[in-house]
Amino acid sequence: MNNLFALCQRSAVIFSIIFTVVACDKLDSPKPISPQIETQKNTQLESNRVELKRGVYSDLTLQPWQAQSEEQTQLLRDLFEGLTAYDVQGNLVPAVAENWQTEDNKTWIFTLRENAKWSNGEPITASDFVQSWQTLSQSESPLKNYLAFMNLKNAKAVLEKALPVESLGLFAENDRTLRIELDKASPYLPSMLAHVSLLPHYAKSTEIFISNGAYQLQRQAENQHILTTNPYYWAKEKVIFQQVKYQKISVDADLSDFDVVMNPKKVNQNIQDYPQLCTYFYEFNLSDPVLQKSAVRKAIVSMISTNNLVADIAHLYPNNTFLPKSMLGEQESVWEPVVAEQLFSQNQISETRPLKLRIRYDDLSLNQTIAMRLNHQLSQSDLLRVENQGMSWQELQTARTKGDFQLIRSGWCADFNDPAAFLNLFYSKSPDNKNGYKNAEFDRLFESAMTTISEKVRLENYAKLKGIVQQEHLVLPIFQYSTPVYLVPSIMGAQVNSVGVIYSKDLWRKVQSQ
């Protein structure tokens, strides 16, 4: 919308469910306003639209490789832009790269925008990305491991100092063409490139801070970073706020002076929950002679109400599927009647031969609460004998490694927004497959999804893979994590998305004239 303040249209556009609808009817015979009052009012309105205030609880960093929290990444994404990024709905979109192509999902060609520039006016080149990632590989940052995680060719050997940094699969064919070579087919590479660790770094020595995002650093103090618009940003005409202030605050701080705060500590109003790409679940021991039967797992899952497990716990989304809801598409779970006792009976489980279940979990408060409620729901059946066993995190990992459990607390978070990040846990050749699940059809579909360059075929395979996980009841899903975000009602442009990203460049303020 070019005229962002022309809101008095009778349209069906919904900006956000938390925003108040303001009546747009014209007033009859408006009273004249003195020029002095009019000028004062307009000055105040324009001032409100100029600056965005964001509160943060952690120390901020200007180095993407040093990011340790979501708060820190928000500042970095305002200052820098990678090859790809996200829109307000969490969809992947071109950023510095205007397009990309591949013929085998292993060798990728990215074409950079001709008008992509640093904040000093210099063009951003393919060599900038090559140098940035090479430097990352030689740093002490744990984020350098992301290069190997994204399957960048020779990354593992380079990180281990077995090969020189020039061996990384990165090539600047010319200023605007970047070739990326991978060790194995990865159709989701563009999604992985939106990660904060891959943001470019200005390599030349300079007295001022140089960035390439929608904003540039104007000044910084101990607890404050002031950003102003980057005059050379390729989409500068879409940036509304001229200034963004990041202010470090205490846990007891009054948030009324701020527009956006992630993970607010003591506020319950004006909160939006942004679902994370993280799921909380219990693993079945698939080597257990009874639990290796899918019918038994199905019976157990059917006894659980995830809504009741997390009903009074804030910022958790009950989830009946292993994958985050944003990855399900139209494949939402369908309820079907299940008689658990009948399935148990068919598998020689009875009151005289009950199934003994040990629920193992690390003894944090949330985990204890979930385990207690889980025990209560399962204990409704006379065919089950349920025992809770809380332990330390390290003891839990030891039990998992030894297979010493029936049900064990688990979870998984993805670094990129693609179903493969979760489905990979059940691919038999994956190092992330810890439960020993092996299914030839699952492996075939997964490998086909990785190698095909047809998005249609890949999505069809993903749907089939999701179906197998669901039908086999490979895990007992509980909930999906979310990040609470404080947003004042006047801030527009923010939409709940699955990647938890709120770019300041996408926001604007609705100010009602008085």
Swiss-Prot record:
PROSITE patterns: SBP_BACTERIAL_5. It is a lipid-anchor. GO terms for molecular function: peptide transmembrane transporter activity. A lipid is attached at C24 (N-palmitoyl cysteine). A lipid is attached at C24 (S-diacylglycerol cysteine). The keyword Membrane applies. This is Putative binding protein HI_0213. It comes from Haemophilus influenzae (strain ATCC 51907 / DSM 11121 / KW20 / Rd).
